[in-house]
């Protein structure tokens, strides 16, 4: 559970960093760029710890996919960006892909033989 929380924090940090980049480019201030650098770095740190126990493909798909989905939605709400039917179709496909990747990944059951072999 702890590693899933780290992944959620990585996603939140990525979203915050990317939205800060847009905010900084619109407002012209340097604060947004500093926040962007800090949050993107934090996002990668959280992701690095999360993949210790979460399969890399699953973690990366969730990190990138949920990030893209929420960044797009927040961009529409905060920066008045357009949301076309084609973008909605793309986001829907993305969500379906994330669900398929997550549901297609099973946790490997470790046997006593594997543990004994690893200790040798």
From Swiss-Prot:
It is a multi-pass membrane protein. Keywords: Cell inner membrane, Cell membrane, Membrane, Transmembrane, Transmembrane helix, Transport. One of its GO terms (molecular function) is choline transmembrane transporter activity. Catalyzes the excretion of spermidine. Forms a complex with MdtI. It comes from Klebsiella pneumoniae subsp. pneumoniae (strain ATCC 700721 / MGH 78578). One of its GO terms (biological process) is glycine betaine transport. This is Spermidine export protein MdtJ.
